[in-house]
Each structure stands twice: as structure tokens, then as C-alpha cells.
């Protein structure tokens, strides 16, 4: 063995083994009006069937249906790597005759996950915190309109500072290639005009692989992704492909010339899953946490009457109360006690070190 070799080069292997053993968690939200192929696309993306037991309401029932939040989980294993996927669905979004404030349950749900994580993170037992925060939201846009509708804009404005948004055009096989490009540009212009932040692809380092740089640029340019989903396998010539057959031909789900399905799956799974989680924690969650601390620091914010007033305000205007007052004071006392014990322990260690040093100096003199 080389005498100059210490062994730090093996550190990535340690991290790899630890990550593989622990597995990965990822929470994905899908939102958008009914009939845009959300369920089919999710099943196509992850090669699973998350909607076996779903009952689809008829058209008359949809007009009175209110938005609900459904959470489904599945463990996917591939090549020894386990991913615990949690899918958050929003059936009923935009289906009611009156869609006023229909996005508020989604906003509350996202903030509740932040609040729960904050509680767990502030507790004494922080070893096994379950991360239920929403890491990404696929927002489906209709291919039949002329861009974003007022409801789309209102929803995206309400959540764009709370979750990574990936806009997708559902059922893109309804459009010609030229129509797809026009609609994409229209949506990009509207997002910029309305100052709506969507997920920003990180800039590649100069030493990144050239193939990865090329893929990253291609994914950036394809936003919003025009997608088609299908669980059906059809034959195109002699090849079995997943796609949809029409009288005029076959749309192949995994053909990059037909739609952006491959780019979307590559981004979500192969290249940017970890970055989506890091942005959620470092930027979106920290922003929520800062707003909570600011709301507690305001004069009178800890007064019960004031807290009651704040809780009645729209979830889009102010963060949810972080903790009940009694719980907050208890947590502060526990933290103070923990800090006091740590300070005492540190002082004892310093005293012991000084005593040992003094004894060592005395023995040297002798």
C-alpha cells in the first residue's frame, strides 16, 4: 500500500453505503383540473399503479365536488436502491362551479408539513424525523386553452414560495408540434409577467460531465414539459412501445420527438431529485421557519387574542402559528435547561483540562 495514502478517497463509498441502506424519501404533489391525465402520467413515470382503488365521479358530481387532499405511498426498489415515494393528490381542484379560494387547502397542507417538521426538529429526539414536506409539485395545464387561466395564476401565486413548481402541459398529443411551442412560450411569458417562481435548474459547474450539461440545458429549454402518459403497450412495426394509438398514427410516450416525458422522468428521478429536496429544505422551509419566528417576535404576537386573530387570516398572507403558547414556553424551558447542562459540562471539562495541564507542568519542573 502507498505510504502516502491515508484513505479519504473512500469517503464517497461510505456515504453511498449509508444512503443505500437508509433509502430515499420523496414527496410529490400533483395538481390541476380533472381530465388532464395526471393519474396516468404518474403511473407511467414510476411504472406502478397508485390509483387501483380510485372511483372517478361523473360530470354532474364534479361540479359540486370540493377539493380534498389524498396521500398515497409506495416503496419502489430498483437495483438495490429503495425509494419511498409519497404522492399527494388534489382531486376536485378546479372542478366546482365556484372555485374561489379552492387552493387554500393545498396551501394549508404544505404549511402543515413544514410546521410538523419544525416541531420535530425543535424537539429533544431528532434522530428519526420523518420528512413529509412536499418536495415538488407537478402542476398540470390544459392544452386546450391559450395559456394560464386565472385559476392557474391564483394557485401558482399562492404556492410558489412554498414548493418547487414544475409546470407540465397535460395530454400534449392534442397539439401539433408548432402549437406546442407557441403554448410553451405563452406560458413562460405569463409566468414571468406574473412574477411566479418555478423550480430553477442549478447552474452546472465547469468540471461537470458534458453529457449532463447538455441534458440540463435541454430540460431547461423544455419547461413547461409537454407530456403524454400511457400504461398500454402497443406495437409500432415490430417494436413494443408504451403509447397511444390513433387513426392517424401512434404517440410513443418515451419518444423525445413526440413529447417531453423522458426529460420529465430524467429530471425527477435521475438528475435533480436530490436538488429538489435540498431547495425545499434550504430555501423554502427556511423561509417558512423565518416567517414563523418573525410572527412570534412581533409585539403582542404571543398574546392569545392576537394569535386567535392571526389564525383567522388567509394562509397565503401569514404563516400558521408555529406552536401553541403553552408548548412554546415548555419547549423554551427545556432548551434553556439543556443549554445550562451543556454549559456546566463544558466548564467541568475545561477545569479538568486546566488541572491536568497544571499537574503536567508541575511534574516537568520536578
From Swiss-Prot:
Segments of this protein annotated with the region G4 motif: 170-173
PROSITE patterns to which the protein is assigned, alphabetical: G_SEPTIN (PS51719)
Region (G1 motif): 32-39
Segments for region (G3 motif): 89-92
UniProt entry keywords in alphabetical sequence: Cell cycle, Cell division, Cytoplasm, Cytoskeleton, GTP-binding, Nucleotide-binding, Phosphoprotein
Entry binding sites for GTP: 32-39, 66, 92, 171-179, 229, 244
Sites of Phosphothreonine modification: 250
Subcellular localization(s) per the UniProt record: Cytoplasm; Cytoplasm, Cytoskeleton; Cytoplasm, Cytoskeleton, Microtubule organizing center, Centrosome; Midbody
Region (Disordered): 347-366
GO BP annotations, alphabetical order: cytoskeleton-dependent cytokinesis; meiotic metaphase chromosome alignment; protein localization; regulation of exocytosis; spindle assembly involved in female meiosis
Domain Septin-type G: start-end pairs: 22-295
Principal subcellular localisation of the protein: cytoplasm
SUPFAM superfamilies per the UniProt record, alphabetical: P-loop containing nucleoside triphosphate hydrolases
Job of this protein: Filament-forming cytoskeletal GTPase. May play a role in cytokinesis (Potential).
Family to which the UniProt record says this protein belongs: Belongs to the TRAFAC class TrmE-Era-EngA-EngB-Septin-like GTPase superfamily. Septin GTPase family.
Subunit structure: Septins polymerize into heterooligomeric protein complexes that form filaments, and can associate with cellular membranes, actin filaments and microtubules. GTPase activity is required for filament formation. Interacts with AURKB.
Name of the featured protein: Septin-1
Species: Rattus norvegicus
Lineage: Eukaryota, Metazoa, Chordata, Craniata, Vertebrata
Gene: Septin1
Amino acid at each position: 500500500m502507498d505510504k502516502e495514502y491515508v484513505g479519504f478517497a473512500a469517503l464517497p463509498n461510505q456515504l453511498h453505503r449509508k444512503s443505500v441502506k437508509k433509502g430515499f424519501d420523496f414527496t410529490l404533489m400533483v395538481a390541476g383540473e380533472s381530465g388532464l391525465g395526471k393519474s396516468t402520467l404518474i403511473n407511467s413515470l414510476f411504472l406502478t399503479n397508485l390509483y387501483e382503488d380510485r372511483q372517478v365521479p361523473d360530470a354532474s358530481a364534479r361540479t359540486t365536488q370540493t377539493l380534498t387532499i389524498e396521500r398515497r405511498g409506495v416503496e419502489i426498489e430498483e437495483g438495490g436502491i429503495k425509494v419511498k415515494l409519497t404522492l399527494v393528490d388534489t382531486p376536485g381542484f378546479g372542478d366546482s362551479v365556484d372555485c374561489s379560494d379552492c387552493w387554500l387547502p393545498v396551501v394549508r397542507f404544505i404549511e402543515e408539513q413544514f410546521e410538523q417538521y419544525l416541531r420535530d426538529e425543535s424537539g429533544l429526539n431528532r434522530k428519526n424525523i420523518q420528512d413529509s414536506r412536499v418536495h415538488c409539485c407537478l402542476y398540470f395545464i390544459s392544452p386546450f386553452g391559450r395559456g394560464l387561466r386565472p385559476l392557474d395564476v391564483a394557485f401558482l401565486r399562492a404556492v410558489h414560495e412554498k414548493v418547487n413548481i414544475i409546470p407540465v402541459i397535460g395530454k400534449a398529443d392534442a397539439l401539433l408540434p408548432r402549437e406546442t411551442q407557441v403554448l410553451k412560450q405563452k406560458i413562460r411569458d405569463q409566468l414571468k409577467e406574473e412574477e411566479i417562481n418555478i423550480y430553477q435548474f442549478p447552474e452546472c459547474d465547469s468540471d461537470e460531465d458534458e453529457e449532463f450539461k447538455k441534458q440540463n440545458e435541454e430540460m431547461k429549454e423544455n419547461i413547461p414539459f409537454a407530456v403524454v402518459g400511457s400504461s398500454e403497450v402497443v406495437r409500432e412495426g415490430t417494436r413494443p412501445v408504451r403509447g397511444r394509438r390513433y387513426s392517424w398514427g401512434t404517440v410513443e410516450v418515451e419518444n423525445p420527438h413526440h413529447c417531453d416525458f423522458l426529460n420529465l422522468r430524467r429530471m425527477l428521478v435521475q438528475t435533480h431529485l436530490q436538488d429538489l429536496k435540498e431547495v425545499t429544505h434550504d430555501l423554502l422551509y427556511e423561509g417558512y421557519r423565518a416567517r414563523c419566528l418573525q410572527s412570534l417576535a412581533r409585539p403582542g404576537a404571543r398574546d392569545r387574542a392576537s394569535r386567535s386573530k392571526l389564525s383567522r387570516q388567509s394562509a397565503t398572507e401569514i404563516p400558521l402559528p408555529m406552536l401553541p403558547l403553552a408548548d412554546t414556553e415548555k419547549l423554551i424551558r427545556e432548551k434553556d435547561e439543556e443549554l445550562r447542562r451543556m454549559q456546566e459540562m463544558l466548564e467541568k471539562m475545561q477545569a479538568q483540562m486546566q488541572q491536568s495541564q497544571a499537574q503536567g507542568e508541575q511534574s516537568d519542573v520536578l
